[in-house]
Amino acid sequence: MKILSVGAGMIGAIVAQELSRENEVTVFDANKAALDKLAAKGGSIKTEHGSVYDAEKFNAIIEANDVVVIAMPGSLAIVAADSALNLKKPVFDISSIPNEYLMNKIQPLANEKETLYVPKIGI
């Protein structure tokens, strides 16, 4: 399975490493140093440097994957979840999107797109 892990921070890097044991994983992050640190550990993880606000690039990377895992701060996670759900990709969200936004915007979008959205994993 092709998995896009959005976020290369402490949690995102661990999640990506675990998922890469049995899947093809690409990690996307705006922090080049975090991506370089992850790549230096070796393994089969691919890295992509960029911003979730660069819709053209981010959407192309989402499209190339089967599932999206979000491991980034809530404000950025909102953008990532919105993009992935609009492209009808299942989302597993480790972030902390505020409950009000989650219930009023993200979950209704997932329902509308008939796409799986699993929020607040591990929180």
Predicted segments — roles?
Residues I3-G7:
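Conserved N-terminal Rossmann-fold NAD(P)-binding element of oxidoreductases
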Residues G12-A13:
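N-terminal Rossmann-fold NAD(P) dinucleotide-binding loop
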Residues S51-A64:
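Conserved Rossmann-fold cofactor-binding substructure of NAD(P)-dependent oxidoreductases
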Residues V52, D66-A81, I94-E100:
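N-terminal glycine-rich "phosphate-gripper" loop used for MgATP/nucleotide binding
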Residues S95-Y117:
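Rossmann-fold NAD(P)-binding glycine/threonine-rich loop
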